[in-house]
Amino acid sequence: MNYLNETIDSLNDKLKSGAVSADQLVKDTIANIKKTDEKINAFITVDEDAKPAEDLDFNNKLAGVPIAIKDNIITNGLKTTAASHILYNFEPVYESTVVAKLKAAQATIIGKTNMDEFAMGSSTETSYFGDTKNPWNLNKVPGGSSGGSAAAVASGEVVAALGSDTGGSIRQPASFNGIFGIKPTYGRVSRWGLIAFASSLDQIGVMSKRVKDSAEVLNVIAGADDRDATVSEKEVPDYTSFLGKDVKGLRVAVPKEYMSDAVEEGVRKEVEAQIELLRANGAIINEVSLPHTKYVVPTYYIIASSEASANLERYDGIRYGYRAEAKNLDEVFLKSRSEGFGDEVKRRIMLGSFALSAGAYDKFFLQAAKVRTLICQDFDKIFEDNDVIVGPVSTETAFDLNSEISDQIKMYNNDILTISANMAGIPAASVPAGLSETTGMPVGFQIMAKRFDEGHVFQVADFIERSNKFYEQTPAGLED
């Protein structure tokens, strides 16, 4: 079963009518993943023992539908590695809240997708389990850190997948792979069972080829959770109710900082075309400014690395994961961490440890926290007079494998247009705008809204999807 032309609704219809059984769907999905993954390496683990839930109720849209999970989200009894050597053999004994909710909705968890190690990266090249390839061009990166989930959806291995987004890790790979991806409001979806990178920024979200499929999945995974104190108890609306609407009268802000000369010409043209589409259909377009955008990258890397250095202290080679051979306890700690973590993870641990040190805390971490407040205030001000903010997801389309992995500054700057949404805790998504005329690769259109206003994000994304029908295009890298 290849899902390039399938949706959750179409699968639900086939299962309900008996055109395909849930058991056969699982078998066909696994067979297709094995075949396709020889090219793209989207999965770290495929659950070959996966079985659909018993007594399926097809009033549940996800009943019997195979879903992929990013490998930093805990799955009970199914290996969860965070794409790291230090967790290469970790098999959890409990379930993350989002996976428990998917199973309660009778979805089938089909496997765990590749990612940058501990979600630290923008290309899925830091994985201990090898690079993932972009289905549109196998010589290009799929983006990161949720590159495996994005490639799995774009290649038709699954109809939807969960990802996580700390600074753009759902939206950038969604953009690079020509699919939809949404990072909900911080606190909209439980992080219980998400392997922490930066706890004040991390958020689980959804990736799918079609906007409605992500809305269906978010309907299931969103909402309160007693085990996560940061989750909001606000009522979760039916996100599909925001689909099928026009954009007449919608107030759309376009930050001038997001349309600078740093944006590739091919990206700019596709984004501008979507803005003009909104204008032509009655949206009110307002040019605005996010004046602290120039500070977001250093601010983010100080805060995120500081939180990461604390979160990753728990990996010591004693309780679980990789343990190096050593002569004494001190050597176990030292060798297990130095051998178990990759270079990028160690780089961020060192940066974070320095920023939190007594001599640097006030100068770096405290200052970054203050700038974060200013970034949040920039967004609050714009949302006083606007419903959504739009622009590019990335300044460029998918770049060549191995072309930026050794240039940390260039790699870190890949997040310059996505980080702010995490800083402000607002919902943000990428929807395909088209193909760049200069590179022939997909371009993502970013949509942001105020906190807990995912509805406007879905409304605009769905309108663009219905207008350009990008989902009808097939990734060129899959052609034999």
UniProtKB/Swiss-Prot annotation:
Q: Where is the active site?
A: K70, S145, S169
**One example of a Gene Ontology biological process annotation:** translation
Q: Which Pfam families match?
A: Amidase
The alphabetized UniProt keywords are: ATP-binding, Ligase, Nucleotide-binding, Protein biosynthesis
Domain of life per record? Bacteria
Q: In the Enzyme Commission scheme, what number(s) does this protein have? A: 6.3.5.7
What catalytic activity does the UniProt entry give for this protein? L-glutamyl-tRNA(Gln) + L-glutamine + ATP + H2O = L-glutaminyl-tRNA(Gln) + L-glutamate + ADP + phosphate + H(+)
Protein's UniProt keywords contain Cell membrane: no
Q: Which GO terms describe its molecular function?
A: ATP binding; glutaminyl-tRNA synthase (glutamine-hydrolyzing) activity
The reply to whether Plastid figures as a keyword in the UniProt entry is no
- What are the record's GO terms for cellular component? glutamyl-tRNA(Gln) amidotransferase complex
Q: Which NCBIfam families match?
A: gatA (TIGR00132)
Subunit structure, briefly? Heterotrimer of A, B and C subunits.
Q: Which PANTHER family match?
A: GLUTAMYL-TRNA(GLN) AMIDOTRANSFERASE SUBUNIT A (PTHR11895:SF151), TRANSAMIDASE (PTHR11895)
Q: What does this protein do?
A: Allows the formation of correctly charged Gln-tRNA(Gln) through the transamidation of misacylated Glu-tRNA(Gln) in organisms which lack glutaminyl-tRNA synthetase. The reaction takes place in the presence of glutamine and ATP through an activated gamma-phospho-Glu-tRNA(Gln).
The record's annotation in HAMAP family points to: GatA
**Similarity-based family:** Belongs to the amidase family. GatA subfamily.
State what protein this is by name: Glutamyl-tRNA(Gln) amidotransferase subunit A
As recorded in Swiss-Prot or TrEMBL, the protein's gene is named gatA
